[in-house]
């Protein structure tokens, strides 16, 4: 089965590294992923979150566009209720002018923040029940289709216009997003990494069964965004996974902190936490390249996917890059000659710091 792989990077903060450096490393990672043969590179939007530093995907996408030539670049996503749909359309039309035919816009309705921060981002924010109307407007403005007579936006267009158009995706981790994507005939990305797979069967069924053909999407197009980590051995993969496990357990305690080293994370687990750690390990997609590749192929076959989006956290950027490189080789992404070797040996800044 031929599966395309894509990447979601959240610019995860890590202990001991400057936050501005983290943002620059996301751009470097996009360049590496392009050389490995990945299909898309998406970046996220979160606010007032010390563990996830990607706050302005549209700006980060522009930087990545200038440093890449082939890979598709996208937001995963733009939290649309914070913004006016027209302004978002203008931003992404500019991005499409910078990287014609390579721009994706993933849309979410979650705040990506706490309620206080969401209110400060947009004191006149749109209610979440206006999300469908915002999508309708955004579709029109991105495609250059006039809004109907009587609509407040009739006669208004988003510039610059061009022959290409950003591809809209609906993001979600519940039934709502699946049904919305199906109604509008848009591609759908299920956030498997948020739910650890819970709810995915029903969401995918709702999307496929309710899909209404649209221009330009005649049939359903869905993907899963999964958290995965690959190392030379399963033991090493689990060791590196301990950083994320510590993060998730701390979050359950109400503590949000930057990602710590695997060594510190392993030393931090208390005897009473070992059961919870074991459960996280069992749910996680971690291991050597074949183990992880087999799990991704199983998911692709189960949901009839031709593409999966992978998100990997690691304190050390070289560990993260090696994980993507090993997975690319296992899945036969067809990176240019020497691409894997370059990725594994590429120079990265020494370690220092999502959902």
Give the ranges of each region predicted by the language model.
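Conserved, mostly hydrophobic/aromatic
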Residues: 5, 33, 37, 45, ...
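Flexible, glycine-rich active-site loops centered on histidine and acidic residues
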Residues: 2-19, 81-146, 196
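Active-site mouth loops of central-metabolism enzymes
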Residues: 9-24, 78-86, 162-172, 280-288
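N-terminal beta1-alpha1-beta2 module of alpha/beta enzyme domains
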Residues: 1-71, 352-354
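Acidic (Asp/Glu)-rich catalytic clusters
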Residues: 61-69, 96-102, 180-183, 208, ...
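A conserved active-site cap/scaffold subdomain adjacent to cofactor or substrate pockets
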Residues: 176-197
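Short, well-ordered coil/turn segments that N-cap beta-strands
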Residues: 1-5, 38-40, 68-73, 98-104, ...
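An alpha-helical appendage that flanks or caps ligand/catalytic pockets
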Residues: 125-157, 198-303, 335-355
């Amino acid at each position: 089965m031929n599966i395309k792989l894509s990447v979601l990077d959240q610019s995860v903060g890590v202990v001991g590294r400057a936050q501005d450096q983290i943002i620059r490393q996301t751009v470097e990672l996009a360049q590496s992923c392009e050389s490995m043969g990945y299909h898309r590179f998406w970046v996220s939007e979160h606010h007032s979150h010390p563990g996830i530093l990607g706050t302005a995907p549209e700006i980060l996408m522009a930087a990545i566009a200038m440093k890449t030539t082939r890979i598709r670049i996208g937001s995963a996503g733009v939290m649309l209720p914070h913004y006016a749909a027209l302004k978002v359309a203008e931003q992404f039309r500019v991005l499409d002018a910078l990287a014609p035919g390579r721009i994706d816009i993933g849309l979410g309705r979650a705040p990506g923040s706490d309620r206080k921060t969401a209110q400060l981002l947009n004191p006149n924010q749109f209610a979440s029940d206006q999300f469908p109307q915002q999508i309708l407007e955004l579709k029109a403005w991105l495609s250059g289709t006039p809004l109907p007579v009587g609509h407040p936006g009739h006669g208004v267009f988003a510039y610059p216009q061009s022959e290409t158009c950003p591809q809209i995706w609906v993001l979600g981790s519940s039934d709502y997003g699946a049904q919305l994507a199906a109604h509008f005939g848009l591609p759908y990305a299920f956030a498997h990494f948020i739910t650890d797979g819970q709810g995915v069967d029903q969401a995918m069924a709702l999307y496929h069964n309710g899909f209404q053909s649209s221009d330009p999407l005649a049939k359903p197009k869905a993907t899963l965004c999964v958290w995965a980590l690959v190392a030379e051995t399963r033991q090493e993969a689990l060791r590196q996974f301990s950083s994320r496990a510590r993060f998730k357990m701390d979050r359950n305690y109400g503590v949000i902190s930057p990602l710590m080293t695997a060594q510190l994370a392993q030393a931090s687990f208390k005897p009473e936490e070992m059961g919870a750690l074991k459960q996280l390990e069992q749910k996680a997609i971690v291991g050597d390249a074949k183990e992880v590749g087999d799990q991704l192929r199983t998911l692709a076959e189960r949901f009839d996917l031709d593409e999966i989006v992978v998100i990997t956290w690691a304190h050390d950027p070289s560990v993260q890059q090696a994980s993507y490189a090993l997975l690319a080789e296992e899945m036969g992404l067809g990176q240019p000659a020497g691409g894997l070797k370059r990725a594994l040996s590429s120079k990265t800044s020494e370690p220092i710091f999502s959902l």
